[in-house]
């Protein structure tokens, strides 16, 4: 029941009163692209949980947290590591569907259709593939692409049992709000 309620809240928070064409109009747990992370937690809290990127070409740092969330089981936020204002560059929300990929994909489809019905002129790109970090795991992605190249990714991740046990991961649904500038930076860093 908690997951059903979470999906309904998720859908409602992704909707906007008018047909939006700006990715900054979308929120995850009340947080939007362009907000300062300092509006949601102290600098000390950020420094305790921040993660530096392993790839030196990546300028964005990340936090993941699970405290005081209403809709998601976890939230991830990225910002430029040199930005002292911690302006949010991208964010994602995670809902766990461990060993329940059928319901994960069902909710993914519901969210995708709801967003498509709420926002016109989005291009849908669906992909399925093997996870790079888990050769026996899979991903199922619906990317909703704005005319300017911004993306809302709705992804189901299905990890193998050995990978789950080793890394303490669970299968999950992840909704990511990804501006084109952020996506371009990652694409360039991994060339």
Each model region followed by its residue ranges:
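Amphipathic N-proximal alpha-helical interface segments
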Residues: 21-24, 47-117, 123-191
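Short, structured motif recognition centered on aromatic/hydrophobic residues
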Residues: 40
